[in-house]
Amino acid sequence: MQKRAIYPGTFDPITNGHLDIVTRATQMFDHVILAIAASPGKKPMFTLEERVALAQKATAHLGNVEVVGFSDLMANFARDRQANILIRGLRAVADFEYEMQLAHMNRHLMPQLESVFLMPSKEWSFISSSLVKEVARHQGDVTHFLPDNVHQALMDKLK
């Protein structure tokens, strides 16, 4: 039986920290679904379609990654995709508290859904999409933190 995992997030935009997690996940699981949440409440800078396209290009070199948008409850999405592993990145203790709540709720909704927590490589442990956007808005150089296609798209958005 194939091990199918979901790595969900808003990915507004996808960063090299996210790519670090998804790349490592591809070595652990047969199929990884990079699930990009619509997240209208967060008022994303990029549309869902843009975020999916950016992530598809950024992960094109990874043969076992599928990038899809979703707006459903995570447990329902996982059930529909026949995945029982949820990948989550943890940068700090503050992330853990929130992620633990989500993991427990997801297990309540879908008992066979297991959460797997991965810490990003040290190089990416402090970055987030929000931080990268904020630095870029103030003309800071964020080239190192984003895939090339994403960096270009962010610069275009900020013009």
From Swiss-Prot:
Its recorded reaction(s) are: (R)-4'-phosphopantetheine + ATP + H(+) = 3'-dephospho-CoA + diphosphate
Kindly provide the name given to this protein in its UniProt entry.
Phosphopantetheine adenylyltransferase
Q: Which organism is it from?
A: Salmonella agona (strain SL483)
Task: Please list the residues that bind substrate.
Answer: 10, 42, 74, 88
Q: Pfam families recorded for this chain? A: CTP_transf_like (PF01467)
Q: Identify the PANTHER family for this entry.
A: PHOSPHOPANTETHEINE ADENYLYLTRANSFERASE
Cellular component aspect of the GO annotation: cytoplasm
Q: Where in the cell is it found?
A: Cytoplasm
